[in-house]
Structure formats: structure tokens, C-alpha cells
């Protein structure tokens, strides 16, 4: 779990737009965040397996 201070800091609008960065909306992880879902790869995988993300299914080829 991310530090609460860093999550709050990322939520604020930065003075310069290039300073903004994405964080997972569920756990606060700063890396490997999918913009479309706002979730990190770990939370995305867990929620997809649980069926909590409509339209997401495991690929097979």
C-alpha cells in the first residue's frame, strides 16, 4: 500500500501539467498504471479474474 501522503500529493493538481502522474485508484501504486481503467497491473488482473471489470476477458490464441 502506498503512503497516504504520496497518494494525496498525486491527487492535487500540479502547478505545471507535466509534473502530474498516474496512480492506481485502488492501491495507490505509481507504476504500471493502465490509464483506461485507472488501475495498476496487479489490481487490474485481480479484478478481471473476479469478473468485476465488464467487457474484460482472458485472451486465448
UniProtKB/Swiss-Prot annotation:
Q: Which GO terms describe its biological process?
A: translation
As given in the record, the signal peptide range reads none
Cofactor binding remark = Binds 1 zinc ion per subunit.
**Which branch of life, at top level?**
Bacteria
Print the keywords alphabetically. Metal-binding, Ribonucleoprotein, Ribosomal protein, RNA-binding, rRNA-binding, Zinc
Is Plastid tagged as a keyword? no
Cite the GO molecular-function annotations of the record.
rRNA binding; structural constituent of ribosome; zinc ion binding
| The protein's required cofactors | Zn(2+)
What are the binding positions for Zn(2+) in this chain? 24, 27, 40, 43
Give a Pfam family name: Ribosomal_S14
Which InterPro entries does the record match to this protein?
Answer: Ribosomal_uS14 (IPR001209), Ribosomal_uS14_bact (IPR023053), Ribosomal_uS14_CS (IPR018271), Ribosomal_uS14_sf (IPR043140)
Give the UniProt entry's GO cellular component terms. Answer: cytoplasm; small ribosomal subunit
Coiled-coil residue spans: none
* Family statement: Belongs to the universal ribosomal protein uS14 family. Zinc-binding uS14 subfamily.
- Give a short account of what the protein does: Binds 16S rRNA, required for the assembly of 30S particles and may also be responsible for determining the conformation of the 16S rRNA at the A site.
HAMAP family according to UniProt:
Ribosomal_uS14_2_B (MF_01364_B)
What quaternary arrangement does the UniProt entry report?
Answer: Part of the 30S ribosomal subunit. Contacts proteins S3 and S10.
**UniProt protein name:** Small ribosomal subunit protein uS14
Organism, by scientific name, is Mycobacterium leprae (strain TN)
Amino acid at each position: 500500500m502506498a503512503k497516504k501522503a504520496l497518494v494525496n500529493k498525486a491527487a492535487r493538481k500540479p502547478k505545471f501539467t507535466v509534473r502530474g502522474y498516474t496512480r492506481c485508484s485502488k492501491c495507490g501504486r505509481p507504476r504500471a498504471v493502465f490509464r483506461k481503467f485507472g488501475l495498476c497491473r496487479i489490481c487490474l488482473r485481480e479484478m478481471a479474474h473476479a469478473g468485476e471489470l465488464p467487457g474484460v476477458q482472458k485472451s486465448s490464441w
